Amino acid sequence: MELADKASFRDAMAHVGAAVNIITTDGPAGRAGFTASAVCSVTDTPPTLLVCLNRSASVWPVFSEHHTLCVNTLAAGQEALSTLFGGKTAMDERFAAADWQTGATGCPRLEAALVSFDCRIDQRVSVGTHDILFCHVVAITRHPEPRGLMWFDRGYHTLMRPAC
């Protein structure tokens, strides 16, 4: 057993696989997006997700002003887009790299996402370095792509949907 310091916690979390998502928003403060794996279901009544966003992230000021977002869960083959949205690239360049539609909330919805959850942000809670956004899902768009994209052991991996 080891003490849970920052480094050991990060190393341990590398062993926990997660879907890769691009979180987007648009509104008075502008259009923004970032890559996130810290996204999960909270409840289905009402349908709610949580999204974690570091307050030191360049996109935080935009998301802090908006009340809607879209969680775009990536499919296999979208690693480059994930990397682009996870870096310091200008927003216009990030969004120019893929095809987007406007979702039910007005947020950018990735056309080729495995699934997109259009959300209204109902609550924000600050914990440590991050804000936790509780997001009420108002619309869902699914893509028939059978392969998901996962982040595990500090790398991308493809997950196949089982054949029926």
UniProtKB/Swiss-Prot annotation:
Record-linked PANTHER family: FLAVIN REDUCTASE, FMN REDUCTASE (NADH) RUTF
Domain of life: Bacteria
EC number, UniProt record: 1.5.1.42
Family that this chain belongs to: Belongs to the non-flavoprotein flavin reductase family. RutF subfamily.
Any one GO molecular function term: riboflavin reductase (NADPH) activity
Protein name (database record): FMN reductase (NADH) RutF
Chemical reaction(s) catalysed: FMNH2 + NAD(+) = FMN + NADH + 2 H(+)
Keyword Oxidoreductase applies: yes
SUPFAM superfamilies: FMN-binding split barrel
Keyword Lipoprotein: no
Keyword line: Flavoprotein, FMN, NAD, Oxidoreductase
Described purpose of this protein according to its UniProt entry: Catalyzes the reduction of FMN to FMNH2 which is used to reduce pyrimidine by RutA via the Rut pathway.
Group of enzyme by EC: oxidoreductase
UniProt record, GO biological process: nitrogen utilization; uracil catabolic process
Pfam family of the protein (one): Flavin_Reduct
Cross-referenced HAMAP family: RutF
